[in-house]
From Swiss-Prot:
Keywords: Ribonucleoprotein, Ribosomal protein, RNA-binding, rRNA-binding, tRNA-binding. Disulfide bonds: none annotated. The gene is rpsM. This is Small ribosomal subunit protein uS13. It comes from Acidobacterium capsulatum (strain ATCC 51196 / DSM 11244 / BCRC 80197 / JCM 7670 / NBRC 15755 / NCIMB 13165 / 161). GO terms for molecular function: rRNA binding; structural constituent of ribosome; tRNA binding. GO terms for cellular component: cytosol; small ribosomal subunit. SUPFAM superfamilies: S13-like H2TH domain. Part of the 30S ribosomal subunit. Forms a loose heterodimer with protein S19. Forms two bridges to the 50S subunit in the 70S ribosome.
Length: 127
């Protein structure tokens, strides 16, 4: 199993698909990496030589951030938005949609499960 950027790539998948298992690499970027490394995108990972895997590693390192560094960068950007108390930071803090979507209906994924009324709870009486 080839290990690239701290991720074990699945051996039985094509190289272009296997690279998308790395956080920060989608289909277009995977194809760009493979063409820069002179590797056939349709070859399976198990068929790649050690030299080809090393070339892929070098291209990924040169191309930009992936995996842990990218996750840390994204988290820092969100934390900065929260600290400067921007509107987007407020939406992140309240776990609401950030990019202008409606929330009256929908947005259940972002808002979480419904918090309905609690059965059996009575208000305190005045004495």
């Amino acid at each position: 199993m080839a290990r690239v950027a701290g991720v074990d790539l699945p051996r039985n998948k094509q190289a272009r698909i296997a690279l998308t298992y790395i956080y920060g690499i989608g289909n277009p970027r995977a194809l760009r990496i493979l063409t820069a490394a002179n590797v056939d995108p349709f070859r399976k990972i198990q068929d790649l030589s050690e030299d080809e895997v090393n070339r892929i590693r070098q291209v990924i390192e040169a191309e930009g951030q992936v995996e842990g560094d990218l996750r840390k960068d994204v988290a820092m950007h969100i934390k900065r938005l929260i600290e400067i108390q921007s509107y987007r930071g407020l939406r992140h803090r309240r776990s609401l949609p950030v990019r202008g979507q409606r929330t009256h209906t929908n947005a259940r994924t972002r808002k979480g499960p419904r918090r309905g009324t609690v059965a059996g709870k009575k208000k305190a009486t005045k004495t």
